[in-house]
Regions:
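Glycine- and acidic-residue-biased ligand/ion/polar-headgroup-sensing regions
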Residues: 85-103
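A short, N-terminal "cap"/entry segment at the start of jelly-roll beta-barrel domains
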Residues: 1-70, 150, 159-171
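Double-stranded beta-helix
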Residues: 127-171
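Conserved short histidine dyad/triad with adjacent acidic residue
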Residues: 64-84
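Short acidic-glycine-tyrosine-enriched beta hairpin
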Residues: 101-121
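A generic "binding-loop/recognition-motif" signal
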Residues: 77, 85-86, 104, 120, ...
């Protein structure tokens, strides 16, 4: 079976069709890093440089030295995640989605909990309305989202630390 993904005009809004990014669902092939980056660029180009994330419902959670980020991915939406600097927990709170990374591809569903390694970047297709939560260290114990994102998110693979780049095969 072929899974055809769509590229949204806004990350969680209307979309147009693009030929397969992933094949043979539910155990489709891993995506190449370059394919995921191209998909992300296409989304940005369609949205005038804007990723459309503000159209997805995003909730922030804070506990001492812990930051949780929860996003609602509407059924049928396709999104590309950020590159994270550190290992962190992922919790699929609700729904089902197909996920492709350079390390493998699989389906995630409500109740799944897993660790993302530093440098992981995902292309995600929400099969159902999906609530996805990531849990990150917040060593500064701040609620300043700009400061948290600077610590948590790498703007590019080149921005990862040397140790992290060895883990993802960049160094």
């Amino acid at each position: 079976m072929i899974l055809d993904m769509t590229i949204p005009v806004s990350a969680c809004g209307p979309s147009f069709h693009i030929q397969h990014v992933c094949t043979d669902a539910p155990s489709f092939k891993p995506a190449q890093r370059a394919d995921i980056v191209r998909l992300e660029k296409a989304i940005l180009d369609l949205n005038g440089g804007h990723d459309g994330a503000d159209q997805c419902h995003l909730t922030h959670h804070f506990a001492p030295k812990v930051y949780g980020r929860e996003i609602l991915l509407p059924a049928g939406s396709d999104v590309v995640g950020k590159i994270h600097r550190h290992a962190h927990l992922n919790v699929i709170v609700k729904g089902r989605a197909l996920v492709a990374t350079e390390f493998g591809s699989h389906e995630v569903k409500a109740g799944d909990i897993f660790v993302s390694e530093p440098g992981t970047k995902r292309a995600v297709h929400a099969i159902e309305d999906t609530v996805w939560m990531t849990i990150h260290p917040n060593e500064a114990d701040t609620q300043d989202l700009e400061q948290i994102e600077e610590y948590v998110i790498a703007p590019s693979y080149g921005a990862l630390s040397f140790e992290d780049t060895k883990k993802v095969g960049v160094a």
